[in-house]
Amino acid sequence: YYIRCQENNRMKNKIFELYKPKSLADFLSFKEENPKENFVYVLQHPPANINILGASDFGYLVICLPNFGPDSQIIFSSSPFVFKMQKNLRDVRQQDYILLTGDPAVIGISCAIVSDYTSGKFNLLKWDRREAKYYPINFDLYQKG
């Protein structure tokens, strides 16, 4: 049992970048062929000096937006951005994870979109600097009590 659990929690070695047409097609095909796999939706590709591979312990990494550089402001016109993120996050399920990276506006809008798609139940990954690892945080926004 321990070995099986350890194997199931091992790093996933595929990374999908939804902003690249071939990678998007590969993701859609892989997701259809592997419906039980979990995915970690990385909202924006992190800078080169930040390693997010530890998040792959929770599922295959799915990067929604490229890294636009440190001086870039992503949202000047909100409608096209909201449409793009609705498209990128449309396959997210309650068992998947969201890795909050990038512009705070990207994070805020994306969490709202994910909440709409999952009826307020979703998982985030939080980085713990002291332990140097990710911890899952489960949300149920409409929970009574």
Label the model's feature ranges.
Residues 102-109:
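Elongated alpha-helical scaffolds
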Residues 11-97, 109-145:
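Long, low-complexity, Lys/Arg-enriched
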